[in-house]
Amino acid sequence: MGYNRTEIPLISAERSITMRVLDIDLDFFLADCCPLAELGHRPSLPGHEPWEASAVRAFLENQCGLSRTAPKPGRIFETHDQALTFWEEQIAAGRLTAPFDVTHVDAHSDLGIGYPGPNFVLFNVLSMPVPKRLDYAAFYAQKKLDEANYLLFALAMRRISSLDNVRNPRSRADIPQVLLDADGNIHLNSLTAQMFAAKNGAEPTVPFRVYDDYRDFRAAGAYDFVTFAISPRYAPKEADGLVEVVGEYIKKEKNFCNGC
């Protein structure tokens, strides 16, 4: 399926309203979370059946406020860390202002529960001046940034003003508690961060809300962008039919999704 480039209007310099991004993963729309498949392979279908298309549309329209007749600018991609690349491109183009609110609809938190864990960000990245943190290509080169921790990097880059995590009912506990303050909000903190606070400024507290039951979620307002990841190692190939369903709500710039 080919997606044509569309023009996304530039935001005005005077805009002060916090922008909002809806960030979805295909694995949210499964009966249960899949174990991570080997590179080049997909999880098996039994126990991980995809939702019916009608249920996906009901969630997107009734709870996220999306419409097929007025799709939002965005992108479909293979792995979820490409959301970070997309956001940085939109910021550079003057279409997205940071920090922005993120609604993360995903079976996983993507906050770094697996290797290399949160410590690289807490002790290495937080020692850097904020402009240097934005060099995400360097973190890719070091094999530290991936689809399981890109949101943690986005937080360290101070791109996110608030984060909602809408989870699959069968999601496993994967939110690193070290990232949370006493109120359950995200506050990246470490001895390293404290040592460099005079130079880098204090790390912001980011309001964080978790919806373990997605039925409790209702979008607080309209979204400016929608991104959607297929995450093939986390979803069986039988779920790929939902890519086109979700794609009806996204005004694609270009075909960034191989094989969609």
Which residues does each PLM region occupy?
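Short, Lys/Arg-enriched N-terminal segments with co-localized hydrophobic residues
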Residues: 3-18
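Conserved alpha-helical scaffold segments that buttress catalytic/binding sites
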Residues: 20-260
